[in-house]
Amino acid sequence: MYKRQLYDGFKKNKTINEVLDKPTVLTIYEMIKSQILSYVNGVIRAGKESVVFWAVSPDNDDIALKTYLISTSSFKKRASYISGDPRFSRIKSGTRNLVYLWAKKEYQNLTSCIGCGIPVVKPIAVRKNVLVLEFIGKNGVPEKTLVECQVNKKDYKSAILLIEQLYKKAHLVHGDFSEYNIFKTKNGLILFDLGSAVDLQHPNSQELLKRDINNISRFFVKRGLTVENPIDVLKKIQNEL
C-alpha cells in the first residue's frame, strides 16, 4: 500500500524530486508510513526558505506540507530570531540543525497560539525540516492573503488585534508580520508563517513589535485607509496608555 502511495505521491511529481534534497524526501516518506499524510500534490507556494505543497491526509482532507530548504543560506541571517529566545537556548552548529530547530519553533509557536484561541493555521505534525499544517482553502487552492484582497477598516482592526493577541495572550511577537502572511477568509483573518515569532524575553522583541505595527500600518495606508498612529498602537499593546 505504501509503495503505491510513495510512487503516486513522489515518483510522478518531478517538482518534489527537483526541489527537495534526499533527506527531506525521506522524511516525507516516513510521514506517509506513519500515516500523518497519504499523498503529496503540487506546489502551493515557493520561496527562498521554504516550499509549500498541497497534500492529502489519511482521512482525505486537504493539508499543507511546508518543507524548509536546507540548502538556503538565508537561515543563517535568521539565527538571531532563535539565539535570543530563552525557549531555544541550545543551538547545535550547522545549517541543517538550525533549519530543524526553525521548523520546531514554528510548530511550537502555532501550538501556543491555538491554545490561546488566536486564529492561526493549525499545526498537525513536525519532523526535522517538514511541517504539516491545516490547509486554508479548498480543492488545493489556498485562500487569498491580504495583499491579494480588497481591504477595509475592519481588516485593519483585525490585523492590529492579531498583533495584540500574540503579545498579550501567547507572549509572542511575530517579527515578520505583513499583508503576505495573513489569510482573509469569510470567517476573518488567519495568521500563518510564525517561524520568526519570538518570546517577549527576546532582547529584540520590542523592536520587532514596533516594526510589525509599522509594516502593517504602512500597507493599509497605501490602500487608502486611515490608521491609528503606530506609536499609540505600540503603547496600547504595551499597556503604556
Regions found by a protein language model. Name each.
Residues G42, P123, D176-F177, P230:
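Residue-level detector of family-conserved "landmark" positions at structurally sensitive sites
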Residues V141-T145, D199-H202:
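Short small-residue beta-strand/loop micro-motif enriched in glycine and branched aliphatics
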